[in-house]
Amino acid sequence: MPPAMADNLDIWAVDSQIASDGAISVDFLLPTGIYIQLEVPREATISYIKQMLWKQVHNYPMFNLLMDIDSYMFACVNQTAVYEELEDETRRLCDVRPFLPVLKLVTRSCDPAEKLDSKIGVLIGKGLHEFDALKDPEVNEFRRKMRKFSEAKIQSLVGLSWIDWLKHTYPPEHEPSVLENLEDKLYGGKLVVAVHFENSQDVFSFQVSPNLNPIKINELAIQKRLTIRGKEDEASPCDYVLQVSGRVEYVFGDHPLIQFQYIRNCVMNRTLPHFILVECCKIKKMYEQEMIAIEAAINRNSSNLPLPLPPKKTRVISHIWDNNNPFQITLVKGNKLNTEETVKVHVRAGLFHGTELLCKTVVSSEISGKNDHIWNEQLEFDINICDLPRMARLCFAVYAVLDKVKTKKSTKTINPSKYQTIRKAGKVHYPVAWVNTMVFDFKGQLRSGDVILHSWSSFPDELEEMLNPMGTVQTNPYAENATALHITFPENKKQPCYYPPFDKIIEKAAELASGDSANVSSRGGKKFLAVLKEILDRDPLSQLCENEMDLIWTLRQDCRENFPQSLPKLLLSIKWNKLEDVAQLQALLQIWPKLPPREALELLDFNYPDQYVREYAVGCLRQMSDEELSQYLLQLVQVLKYEPFLDCALSRFLLERALDNRRIGQFLFWHLRSEVHTPAVSVQFGVILEAYCRGSVGHMKVLSKQVEALNKLKTLNSLIKLNAVKLSRAKGKEAMHTCLKQSAYREALSDLQSPLNPCVILSELYVEKCKYMDSKMKPLWLVYSSRAFGEDSVGVIFKNGDDLRQDMLTLQMLRLMDLLWKEAGLDLRMLPYGCLATGDRSGLIEVVSTSETIADIQLNSSNVAATAAFNKDALLNWLKEYNSGDDLDRAIEEFTLSCAGYCVASYVLGIGDRHSDNIMVKKTGQLFHIDFGHILGNFKSKFGIKRERVPFILTYDFIHVIQQGKTGNTEKFGRFRQCCEDAYLILRRHGNLFITLFALMLTAGLPELTSVKDIQYLKDSLALGKSEEEALKQFKQKFDEALRESWTTKVNWMAHTVRKDYRS
């Protein structure tokens, strides 16, 4: 591949001949002040380069002043602008990637704490010096607390036994319960497993009860070997641990075998579970090595502990409940408003608690100016300071006011068509910028003094009066070009003013309860309880009217005793601008029953910002198992964005569970790191990542290997894109293979735990099987050899340039649907493959082996592309090609069940763009969908006409397979239809959960999930406002419509197939 000069800054990748081990000119700075320039191989290790330099040093002045070579190491400034000392000299120069090719020879440092900071900065993609430079008291306080928290976690690991360490580092994956429909897939009620001893060719198979504990398998294997080898090989079952063949996964503990996810999957897929008996001494050796690293980390941390804070002076403070003055601020001026001098500008301000407006918004006067707009205007809100809730936020919107006649001429710098406008009194208001800030600081002190707020210019859709209460309370870090608002909070002249502490709130509630009887909630009769139940049964999107909210608040004790799940609606009914109601609610919350975790998730939505409510919600989540927490981790990371302060119950909870379970830790790491580039959350996610790394030093090496591999793949993908136009596909593939064979790439991409699944080892690339795909972003198709029993290879796709977060969300929903169906005793053989965003528009996708797209199956069965889509026998014939007899019957059964699952799922989620290249089938019969670029009913259209007219895909070739190729097989089709109806009703019973999970993702910035209106599709598809009978009738109509209009799908597929055949 020829050199590409598109990005001259990336000297380590782009400006190089990737077909050869190119050299680069590096400047070396010696401690004596001598400067030497050498040509060194890009792929050389730091140790080799040091030896090269030392040979040259002899020829330069003042050599005699230098110490021994081992007394020195190199230092550089890395890609995150951090000064990094290169202590690990086995690393290659092209992997170190200095910002410039300059290496400084320095005396070996003895400060291990600085080295750890440097490693953490490289790993999280953000130098820790950036946090120091902020000089933000909240950031510093949080980092100090989290450092103490993480160090305590490390200390707790030191006392673990090796088996507890194994449980923490390689946690077994369990299923919650035993499924009834597994019985027919066992062999006479027995489970068949294969076991072989490590470093031995002996393989033993057993038929055992699925309810046995793993230790019993150890015992059976040892007994069987004793019968062959005799007593010289006698050993105890406790001397071994079962390891899944070819995976970093261990099966141990007290759970029955059938509850281990690996064994469950083997049974469902009718494959043989295969284990290796590993000696415990090998595990203990791994344990001891990590303990050494942990003890070193403890020493590193303790060597650089921050100095203790000086004792605080006792000072008099006041509480806001003693202040009955109206809340007011001074709007001083605005800078860099980016409007013409003649354009008049307003500022609108509103006080919010969640999405609730606490009082009327206030608007400044209209002024115009060139750059600075000076108001010096006092804005007074219709609420007293004493009634301000703790989580009140002040939201600003800056907008230009233009006459309709002058609009066309005056808006060239505002780009009005991009955002919504408000028309009032013959004028048009165009948004310019928005910004939010908290009324209280992270310590609960009422803000005072001058504040400069650097604003954001990107407006989401459907804002209330252009204010964006759901937006971040962080100001724009790119201050140089951002609109700035200068405001002044009133000074507290006598003493600082705080929100009352918890004990004062409870005292106030007790005082109210014992005093005014009007404040005490009453009890409702049967009639009121029936009305209350009807209100509480509504879905989370339903709006409450004023009378309904009053009724819920009045009957709050009935809610607590009879309808504890009503808590979200009670919280929406309280008047948050009334201190008496807030105090009584906090007291009530202390005795409110714990909600099931799935119901408590709703309380983390933006509508519920109160600190104590969110602490209550997190308390409910503590009941979750690790497997259940993993299921909802995507949403829990997203709702961190709703937290106004760094130190909160949710961030501590996630850190605690991640540090207790390395599998959760890996996914938390990647969910955070994939968005650390986003300005609004860069600091928040960055400091949480730092805390995780400090508390999981043993995991850093694994994560660093993954980061290094992904950086290599990103570089390779960029090179392929740059040269795709110049080279033929064959030449491009050859150049890709040449690159992957280079030692630097081979080492970086080998023997790493898959980011998609830490149990899977990506051992060695099958370079000749690797390729890049034809789509615009040239995804990399990578094939690895597999060490797993009965598995030849493992495939992953690396994408760079596509946002995978919407695919992640859709696949998560498919996984949840699969779980809910199984809980109800219905297994629809869903296949939600792995997908993980790992960076800015980049990530990994799992390749499902032995599968083909419907388009390829149809094309391969026909000589003419135009008729391929209409060949109803193609799919059944393809299944017959790989299956016969009983296997064919099982394949058709797999197809029938999975087709039912995906029909219902694609209808409920509104998955669009369903053509024959994003529906696939495994050779075993499982059907599954891929590529979820359009969801929630956002179907593709052309010239205003929807290309997809059916609610879900159900073509006649699918029905042909379901009916086993027999046209009149109504029994099989009737069973398929019944499966679809049962599956739909099961999902509908959990409709509130789906709405909650999508609502929690509103802040993710997904293109098709930007407002509550987008979630309305779910409410409609699940018919949540109707009875079950009405809902089922609606689904039956949709089913008939899909069947009736399936010819339109075939026409679309024909057009797609013809285009595909033409392109190839």
UniProtKB/Swiss-Prot annotation:
Sequence ranges assigned to domain PI3K-ABD in this UniProt record:
20-109
Q: Name one GO molecular function term.
A: ATP binding
| Family affiliation | Belongs to the PI3/PI4-kinase family.
This protein's domain notes:
The inhibitory interactions with PIK3R1 are mediated by the PI3K-ABD domain and the C2 PI3K-type domain with the iSH2 (inter-SH2) region of PIK3R1; the C2 PI3K-type domain, the PI3K helical domain, and the PI3K/PI4K kinase domain with the nSH2 (N-terminal SH2) region of PIK3R1; and the PI3K/PI4K kinase domain with the cSH2 (C-terminal SH2) region of PIK3R1. The inhibitory interaction between the PI3K-ABD domain and the C2 PI3K-type domain with the iSH2 (inter-SH2) region of PIK3R1 is weak. The nuclear localization signal (NLS) is required for its function in cell survival.
Give the protein's recorded name: Phosphatidylinositol 4,5-bisphosphate 3-kinase catalytic subunit beta isoform
In which residues does the motif Nuclear localization signal (NLS) occur? 404-412
What is a single cellular component term in the Gene Ontology annotation?
A: cytosol
Map out region (Catalytic loop) in residue numbers: 910-918
Q: What does the PTM comment state?
A: Phosphorylation at Ser-1064 down-regulates lipid kinase activity.
State which pathway it belongs to.
Phospholipid metabolism; phosphatidylinositol phosphate biosynthesis
Which residues, renumbered to this chain, carry the PTM Phosphoserine?
Answer: 318, 1064
Domain named PIK helical is located at: 518-695
| Residue ranges constituting the PI3K/PI4K catalytic domain according to the UniProt record | 766-1047
- Report whether Transferase shows up as a keyword of the record: yes
UniProt keywords, alphabetically: ATP-binding, Autophagy, Cell adhesion, Cytoplasm, Endocytosis, Kinase, Lipid metabolism, Nucleotide-binding, Nucleus, Phosphoprotein, Transferase
What is reported when this gene is inactivated? Answer: Mice have defects in autophagosome formation. Have normal bleeding time but are resistant to thrombosis after arterial injury. Mice fail to induce tumors in a model of prostate tumor formation induced by Pten loss.
Tell me the InterPro entries matching this sequence: ARM-type_fold, C2_domain_sf, Kinase-like_dom_sf, PI3/4_kinase_cat_dom, PI3/4_kinase_cat_sf, PI3/4_kinase_CS, PI3K-type_C2_dom, PI3K_ABD
Compartments where located: Cytoplasm; Nucleus
The record's function comment reads: Phosphoinositide-3-kinase (PI3K) phosphorylates phosphatidylinositol (PI) derivatives at position 3 of the inositol ring to produce 3-phosphoinositides. Uses ATP and PtdIns(4,5)P2 (phosphatidylinositol 4,5-bisphosphate) to generate phosphatidylinositol 3,4,5-trisphosphate (PIP3). PIP3 plays a key role by recruiting PH domain-containing proteins to the membrane, including AKT1 and PDPK1, activating signaling cascades involved in cell growth, survival, proliferation, motility and morphology.
Q: What is its EC number?
A: 2.7.1.153, 2.7.11.1
User: Reaction(s) catalyzed by this protein?
Assistant: a 1,2-diacyl-sn-glycero-3-phospho-(1D-myo-inositol-4,5-bisphosphate) + ATP = a 1,2-diacyl-sn-glycero-3-phospho-(1D-myo-inositol-3,4,5-trisphosphate) + ADP + H(+); 1-octadecanoyl-2-(5Z,8Z,11Z,14Z)-eicosatetraenoyl-sn-glycero-3-phospho-1D-myo-inositol 4,5-bisphosphate + ATP = 1-octadecanoyl-2-(5Z,8Z,11Z,14Z-eicosatetraenoyl)-sn-glycero-3-phospho-(1D-myo-inositol 3,4,5-triphosphate) + ADP + H(+); L-seryl-[protein] + ATP = O-phospho-L-seryl-[protein] + ADP + H(+)
Q: How does it assemble?
A: Heterodimer of a catalytic subunit PIK3CB and a p85 regulatory subunit (PIK3R1, PIK3R2 or PIK3R3). Interaction with PIK3R2 is required for nuclear localization and nuclear export. Part of a complex with PIK3R1 and PTEN. Binding to PTEN may antagonize the lipid kinase activity under normal growth conditions. Part of a complex involved in autophagosome formation composed of PIK3C3 and PIK3R4. Interacts with BECN1, ATG14 and RAB5A.
Domain spans labelled C2 PI3K-type: 323-490
Residues of the PI3K-RBD domain? 188-279
- Gene, per the UniProt record: Pik3cb
- Renumbered to this chain, region (Activation loop) spans 929-955
- Spans annotated as G-loop: 772-778
